[in-house]
């Protein structure tokens, strides 16, 4: 018999698998690897299979999207060409840096594909998303934007409140 038990976030899910409260779980593909090598939490976890179909997306606040459209008129069409790059975001990031601030972006977990995809998207436009070091497991070293863990159910409300200006998430 299997009982499905919802967890509030990825960290709690991982902790509950490690401490034995859960016998197994659908988790982020990077979590078993990260735990096994001791990134954050040290535990030997084996994964049976991966279900990721690369369905993640990046969302930005309407105010940021309006600024991106000003920077690239091609985005102001009914159906802008996809994929949409972060090139039009770069001047916005620079303006915030000039004001002593950083653009705030959310992702679901440090070892999630969402984090890596968001970092790649930003870096491909010359926006430094930060890097990991032995003393910085948050990946904020030399960052031009601030990436933070935001639980998926909280992302829309956190965006609406202005605590983040964008995020990367996918459907489970």
Question: Can you describe what each PLM-predicted range is?
Answer:
Residues 1-151, 157-172:
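Short, glycine-/small- and polar/acidic-enriched structural segments
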